[in-house]
Amino acid sequence: MKTICLLLACCLAWTAGHAQNDSLQTDSLLRSLPEVMVTGERPIVKAEAGRLVFDLPHLLKDRAADNAYEALKELPGVTEQDGRLLLNGRPVALMLDGKASTMSASQLVALLQTIPVSRLKDAEVMLSAPARYQVRGQLINLNLQRSLADVLQGEAKLFGRQQHDSKYGAQASLLWQQGGWAADAYWRMDGGRAYHVMNDESRHTLHDGSLHQMDSEQRTHASGPVHSYRLAADWMPAENHRLSLAYTGNYAKKRNDLSIDGAVKAASRYDGHNLMQNLRMDYATPFQLKAGVDYTYYEAPMKQELASLLPTGRLDYTTHNNQRINRWKFFAQQEHTLKGGWSLNYGISLTTTNDHSWQDYEGSTPSWGRLEGTPHRETITNVYAGFTKSWGRRVSLDLSLAAERYHSEAFSEWAPFPNLTLQWLPRSGHVLQLSLSSDRSYPEYWAVQQATNYSMGGYGEIVGNPDLRPSKSYQLQGLWLLHNKYQFVAWYEHVDDYFVQTNYQRPDRLVMEYRWLNFDYHRQAGLMAHVPVSLGQWLRSSLSAYGVWQHEKDGDFYDLPFSRHVVYGMFQVRNTIVLSQRLTMQLNGSYRTRAIQGIFDLPASGNLSAALEWKPLPQRLTLKLYGNDLLETNAIAPEMHYHTQHFRMHTSSYREVGLSLTYTFGAYKERRHEAVDTSRFKQE
């Protein structure tokens, strides 16, 4: 019933926007997307040398998005999953002002949420980022507005939201600029409590044929404030000379209280914190040379106390562990603009990491649960070269090749990463683009440590895997942009050594083992269509539809080799209703059909959200009321029924209602912010 309601709500405003002229519905595709529909409209997107550039102020007009993170979700093909953004259903790198983001998903979300939409200029979307960007794969580069005047500007925001428990927060931003000097600062705090329930149904079969029903219910109360802060300064001694220095920090104090009932009866408490500090300096010259250094320190100490009664006995222990990271990155890059539409670029980067992690137990636990504090070191060296060539305004080519050497105690390897983007503009407003790219992804540092943590009251063991290898991926994509408005994308991706954390009911012990493993490969092919429709000045709607084929194979998955494939669909509808000059409403819905991950089946899920935004003082004061997951259909219940493996997990989902108040002074236009990569650090 909830699914039916979700689909009806998603289609409501779309139906209104689509009911324009019957002749438009019966014509061919090219005629049903006529020029008359865009007459008098300023193009939202245009093509530039292998990328699509979206005019964000125009795209976000009357939208309820009030920060950069929400703004990115308005781009065609962009969706949100587990707190991170995807482009066409696959991972995408994010940049600010053309500088690679090195921040983890959670840190990047916190940063983007501090940037108001009034500071956004445009977003450059690339299906295949050239090597000069020092990232690989899909990329969204977010450019911010800049002011040349001497200014003192800022913004303050208060917000609160209610799910099962309440959360609250505040943030402040400030920019000062005078002459050749500029400085900016921001601070954000998130507080409150969170509550969720997880129900596990586990039918566990051992070697002796005995069957054990290990069902349990886990209730978690989580609390702890999170503080994000940044100080930065720029010095511009002459035109096109810029020396930048920035300090970014994040501190999160965490406390989780768990109670478990069922086949396992347990009480557990987690106490700890995460601290990240980053210092970055870079210099840009007028002759297109850029160089810099980046240093990151990260620590995540944690203490867990567990008292548990299992069918196999009792666990009563205290564990202490910590991850401490020191990482340096040095980089330099050079570009040359040549005659005849040619340009040349090349560069080098060196990243060194020292991971000093340890773990120790006190109490009734086996000795193999301990991890000595042996440093783990790795070095990544990357060199690249590339060129671009334009033939008039209609045809452009961007070709580059990067060579990367990864070295650690486990293995050492060189790997090439070619990249190609070919773009053709057959006529005004029409773009055809073909891209080929490759990438390598690395597991988080804690995943490769020989450490063991307990979950589910001791029935679950989270085990590290020192033999985990990086994955290699290859992507081929094609894009068709019609009338600078309608977007169609096709892609194929092959990933060798695809790694994912999965669980396995051990046949020799009554234990559910969680471990990161490499699959043989992961393959995916898909189609995406994005169609916007407007009805007068009061309704703007867009529909994005995806069709995806996915295949995963692993010939040595414990004693259960598998080869599984699925075809699934995703649908997303966004509607903006202009009620008055100062009052707008947004109604968004999404739905995904059944999918898979390894031997898991992922049931269908959906989300319905709404927002009402009032601006009593335009450009100064904004009040926003919003609701997310209104039908409580966003959480899924993954399950596996494969040979001897039978398990189902259901996580609670609560609708969220929130209210925010934002005050801006000085027509604030924030300067660029750097990001810090903590994606491979241990997160609790």
What are the residue ranges of the model-derived segments?
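Short, acidic, small-residue-rich periplasmic hinge/interaction motif at the N-terminus
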Residues: 21-60, 80-82, 89, 124, ...
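N-terminal periplasmic accessory domains that precede
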Residues: 68-71, 108-110, 125, 135-157, ...
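Short acidic/polar hinge/loop motifs at secondary-structure boundaries
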Residues: 101-127
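Transmembrane beta-strands of outer-membrane beta-barrel pores
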Residues: 158-164, 178, 189-193, 249-253, ...
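Face-selective signature of the C-terminal outer-membrane beta-barrel domain
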Residues: 181, 226-252, 267-415, 419-429, ...
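Outer-membrane beta-barrel signature, preferentially recognizing the C-terminal barrel domain
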Residues: 440-490, 494-496, 514-526, 534, ...
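Gram-negative outer-membrane beta-barrel transporters
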Residues: 520-592
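Conserved C-terminal beta-signal and adjacent last beta-strands/turns
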Residues: 564-684
